[in-house]
Amino acid sequence: MKPTALLWIAAASAFFALVTLKAESRPRYGGTLRVEMSAALNNLDPAEIPSDPVALEAKARLVPVVFETLVRLDENGKPQPWLSTSWTHDVARKRWVFTARPHVRLHNGMMWAPTASSLETPDDRPIEQILRELARPWNSIVVHDPDGTLTGTGPFRVARWEAGKAAKLVANEAHWKGRPYLDSVEIQMGRDLRDQAQDMQLGRADITDTPIGTSGELRTDETLALIFDTPRSTPAVREAIALSIDKVVIRRVLLKGRGDISEALLPQWLSGYSFLFDSKRDVARARQLAIGSPPLTFAYDRQDAVLRSIGERLSVNAMEAGITMRPGNGMADVRLVMIPVTSRDELAALTDIALVLRTPFSFSASPYEAERALLDGFHVIPLFHLARNWSLSSRVRSWPDLPNVWIGQP
């Protein structure tokens, strides 16, 4: 074959490869996304906020694609118009009036038309604080149909829901921002990590959960922490456990250098002050504080190999301080959990963390003061900030922004 012919073939191959690449870079409509998760949700009612951190993270992610709020936070955490196009106040600044977005259709086919095309809220707080609270998914607009069905305005609607087991979301063809790329989302709930990994390997799933600390993402969205649920431990014993933990070794060996060591509930990128919550390991001081400590039952997810190894290491560290933490069934004294950071607004994120901790919370405090109050008494001991982990099939694009997810070539 002549050299010119070879050059022509090479050029043609490169051209067609470029065309294919450009075509693949354009989102395509259609297809079903198959999602498996560990969380088991009873419903998507925004009024029912779960205290279980796994369920809280899943519900906070799914609610906004079915139900929408008057405002939403952008990538920088700033409130932006959503179902409300604008807002104003009365002369006394005691009442705020929100103008409803026109031409918004509910999932049941009816138009969303609030009385006088506006909604009012009596509230004399600064508008910035009101907007940030309204942006929480738990403050979504929900319409109750006569049969009790909850109807929203989001880019997806619920086509089928089996509490705690499975669900199907289908595209809202009449969404005011245009329909999503996917035709539907099939969700399997309550799946353990082993089954999820097997389904991903066999091509039965597109999105699954993965063990903690396996993501290389730089931005951290979850906080690994110890939570004390019973009164068996005193503040001194809880502080002793905090002082006994060798976070440097855990991060280097068990987390393979991933994540950030921190004693704050919120990551540095969100709050800007997490470095203020800092203390050094002090086993000698921990032994003094731990004198007379009773044995504590300790719970963590044994299906997650990384979480299990961290739990075992924490028990060893506590033993060095003279505290016994042994695995227990049922209601444990101590839990090792991943607490989700559900919002780009500090106070909104802390409010949801307070739900996980089952602790009262004041939305009017400054973020630092609110976080300091949650940390007082060592009822929660933050350990690491880690990225949220998923396994994705090769055909998934734009995850986890579900309204913009599309199916490409594997």
Locations of regions flagged by a protein language model:
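Surface-exposed binding/hinge segments that line
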Residues: 28, 95, 99, 108-149, ...
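N-terminal lobe/hinge region of extracytoplasmic solute-binding protein
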Residues: 36-91, 151
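Ligand-site clamp/hinge motif
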Residues: 173-217, 221
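Periplasmic-binding protein-like
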Residues: 231-270, 310, 366-379
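Ligand/substrate-recognition segments at binding pockets and active sites
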Residues: 289-342
